[in-house]
Design a protein with these regions (language model features):
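Positively charged n-region of N-terminal signal peptides that target proteins for export
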Residues: 1-6
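Conserved, short, structured surface segments that act as functional micro-motifs
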Residues: 126, 151-206
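Hydrophobic membrane-insertion alpha-helices, especially the h-region
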Residues: 8-23
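Solvent-exposed loop/turn segments at secondary-structure junctions
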Residues: 15, 83-84, 102-103, 117-120, ...
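Zn2+-dependent peptidoglycan hydrolase active-site motif and core
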Residues: 107-148, 172-174
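A generic structural motif
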Residues: 97, 128-130, 180
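A cross-family glycoside hydrolase active-site/sugar-binding cleft signature
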Residues: 78, 138, 178
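Surface-exposed, glycine-biased beta-strand/turn segments
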Residues: 23, 27-123, 155, 164, ...
């Protein structure tokens, strides 16, 4: 298990522990009443985030994922899983090509774990999903307005826009989409389905 997996495992276990404490005792830490309003708000916010992570960790992983890039169908994706990359790396994800600025949505329900930048991915978003899986959206041209860590998301939630940030400069605009489980990266292509909105999916289920 690599360092990133260890960190996410720790977050999951901490979330489960916090959630279990509330379930068993029926209340949060009694010391919260002695905090200042700001401290109490921060404690409440942290608890809410841990609760979201805990509930997601207890759920079975999603068997199907909604296409994250608007206007792209699954059959348009050229399989790039495992392709050789610089430094002898294997490609641990799928590149989904589209025009710069094309909207990128969450492929699943979950909670935003990170909104930031790194050298390889450029502007990236991590979403924590059911079963503790992490969904990685990289090379974004920009983030969705007001998107922040801790936000609950659905397949209707805009995360950002297709771009070429990070080590994708000089390539056609695309989204690098990765999926990570406890054992490491898994190929997202077999899980992807053509995009439908969460509202439409709910209507189909309720028929």
């Amino acid at each position: 298990m690599n360092r990133v997996s260890h960190i996410f495992l720790y977050v999951s276990l901490a979330a489960l522990a916090s959630f279990a404490a509330i379930v068993l005792t029926g209340k949060a830490d009694s010391r919260a009443g002695n905090e200042t309003p700001t401290e109490a708000q921060e404690t409440s916010g942290a608890f809410n985030r841990y609760s979201k992570f805990a509930l997601l960790s207890l759920q079975a992983p999603d068997e199907k994922l909604s296409m994250p890039v608007k206007g792209v169908s699954r059959r348009q994706i050229a399989d790039t899983w495992g392709a050789e990359r610089s430094g002898g790396r294997g490609h641990r994800g799928q590149d989904i090509f589209a025009k710069r600025g094309t909207p990128v949505y969450s492929a699943t329900e979950g909670v935003v774990l990170r909104v930031g930048e790194n050298d390889l991915g450029g502007k990236v978003v991590f979403v924590y999903g059911a079963g503790g899986r992490r969904y990685y959206y990289a090379h974004l041209d920009d983030f969705a307005p007001e998107l922040k860590e801790g936000d609950a998301v659905t397949t209707d939630t805009l995360l950002g826009y297709v771009g070429t940030t990070g080590n994708a400069r000089g390539t056609p605009p695309h989204l690098h989409f990765g999926v990570y489980a406890a054992g490491g990266a898994i190929d997202p292509l077999p899980l992807l389905t053509d995009r439908i909105s969460a509202k439409t999916a709910k209507a189909i289920i309720e028929r």
